[in-house]
Amino acid sequence: MSEEEKAELENMQVESEAKTSENDQTIDTKVDVADVTTHVDEDLDNKEEALDFSEDELSDLDENQFENFDESKIGREAEEPTIYNLPTFKKKQEPNTIEENLEVPRKVRKEQKPRRRRGKRSSTVDALNDELNELGENEEEVLTEQKQLDPTLAAKKELDLQMDAVLKPTRTKKRSNEDNLEQMADDEVLRLREQMRLAALRDAELNSEQLPATEKLKMLPLVDAVLRKTHLYDTILDNNVLDSVRMWLEPLPDRSLPALNIQRSLMDILTKLPIQTEHLRESKIGRIVLFYTISKKPEPFIKRIADNLVSEWSRPIIKRSANYRDRAVGVASFNPEVFQTRRRRDLAAAESNDDAQASRTGRTVIPRSIDSRYQVAPRVRLNPTAMTIAGRMKPADTEQVRKLKAKMKAIRSKSSKKSGVSIEGRGL
């Protein structure tokens, strides 16, 4: 064997001996610990047996033996030091945390202060004071946190707060602006209503004094401009401006109607306003519009507008639909003989009335138009099923259809031919 191999074998033997010695030591320590625990358990059992007195031994004692007992003569063991007598050890603090720890005892003292019991009012005051103190303490904590932050973090936090303040929605401002606009619209409409009422009263006074009533005409452009604003429709109806419109459309004291410009403008405005039944009940404008449909003084186009308004406003009252399909039309069967006899009778009555009136007045009578609006529809006598069957059975290849097809075929053949002369000389 070489010297190197011998050295390696010696090293391996030394390592194995060291490991065996360590194992023996660990086993010895385990045995010693087990012996100690057994001895401790035996001592505790002996003490318990010594302290365990039976009831018979205690009953044999005589109480008279302890009459002249003096406790001062008995030797006492030295009192064991309590926890409060133990020395205190303070941990070394860093200079950065000293300021934080100095503020803690102040807060603890504030919380440990006893509070006096008072009545209900004083308790509420105390609660408010406590809340204020807590808010102040929170603000102080925030300030201390800001001081402790690094300058870079503090600048970043301040920038974030500024961005949040800029991007915060301004709903309260928008709501306040909307309220201001609504208030301005209400003021404008109320002012206009009062001016219209005063103008109507002034024109009535001037007309009764036989003077020209021009107050409403002067104010008409302003009224027309305001009442035609679509965003003010609800405000106009809520503030009962229709009452002033009714006063403008009423006849004057001399029973004359207002100017034609006023009638035309206000009637057109009434057709565009979304008037409901409660608005008609409050303003009573339906009566004056109905008067325009009955009276003979208004112009025909004014009467037509009034008729349309009355029919539109009366539908919800009488519960009638505005759809033409839902309209109930009376139907009657047509009898030619009855129609001829009735027509002859009506013509004879009309001629006799015209002759009597002409003889009475001594002049000719102007013919007038007759109302051609019918209230009763004729009954349909055709059978739709028979018409469809006859149409299907009718032959499609009739003489007229054949001629039409031939004509169309000739037109197509002419259009398909190329214009110009061919190479062979065709088309010359």
Curated annotation (Swiss-Prot):
Residue ranges annotated for the TFIIS N-terminal domain, each copy included: 243-320
Top-level taxon of origin: Eukaryota
Subcellular location, record wording: Nucleus
Pfam families registered for this protein in UniProt: Med26
Stretch list, region Disordered: 1-126, 346-365, 408-428
Entries under InterPro entries matching the protein: RNAPII_TF_IWS1 (IPR051037), TFIIS/LEDGF_dom_sf (IPR035441), TFIIS_N (IPR017923)
Bias kind Basic and acidic residues: ranges: 16-41, 70-79
GO biological process assignments: poly(A)+ mRNA export from nucleus
Coiled coil regions in record: 2-65
Residue ranges with Acidic residues bias: 42-69
GO cellular component: mitotic spindle; nucleolus; nucleus
Main subcellular location: nucleus
Ranges of compositional bias, category Basic residues: 107-121, 408-417
UniProt keyword terms in alphabetical order: Coiled coil, Nucleus, Transcription, Transcription regulation
PROSITE patterns: TFIIS_N (PS51319)
SUPFAM superfamilies, per the entry: Conserved domain common to transcription factors TFIIS, elongin A, CRSP70 (SSF47676)
Family: Belongs to the IWS1 family.
Function: Transcription factor involved in RNA polymerase II transcription regulation. May function in both SPT15/TBP post-recruitment and recruitment steps of transcription.
Name assigned to this protein: Transcription factor iws1
Record organism: Schizosaccharomyces pombe (strain 972 / ATCC 24843)
Gene giving rise to this polypeptide: iws1
